[in-house]
Amino acid sequence: MRLRPTRITALALGLLGLFGCAGERPDNLGAQDGLLVPCPRSPNCVSSQATDERHRIAPLTFADEPDAAWARLRTVLIGRADATLIEEQPGYLRLELRTTLFVDDAEFLLDRANRVVHVRSASRLGYSDLGKNRRRMEEIRRQFAPRGKRP
């Protein structure tokens, strides 16, 4: 089968659109008064601060000193092949986490008093992520658990 120039152009534009699914980097993320931005109504977001079951995920918990736990989490996150660190503040990390086609935004907020790290992960594009953000946060939870306490 021989492709005509118009088909080649259409194919090239289609591939460009397919692989250019990063979307714009959100400018509304970050922590305000100990809170992360709420999830949108779409199911492609999870947050430990969400009140509805659709979006709710447990925060990361730790028993060791907050600074040690934070350093361990940072090591886990920075070591991920799919992660790019976007912002780092004391007790706050924001990363882009990539899949084959898409970019998701993940945030981590240290709550020293309660010995937890609040998490939020959301897809930039689309409506459903087929549970990808939740699975990824659970994977990070397992990696974050101290050695000997991993499930």
Whereabouts are the PLM-identified features?
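Bacterial N-terminal signal peptides
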Residues: T9-L18
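Bacterial N-terminal signal peptides that target proteins for export
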Residues: M1-A10
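Ser/Thr-rich, low-complexity intrinsically disordered terminal regions
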Residues: G20-P151
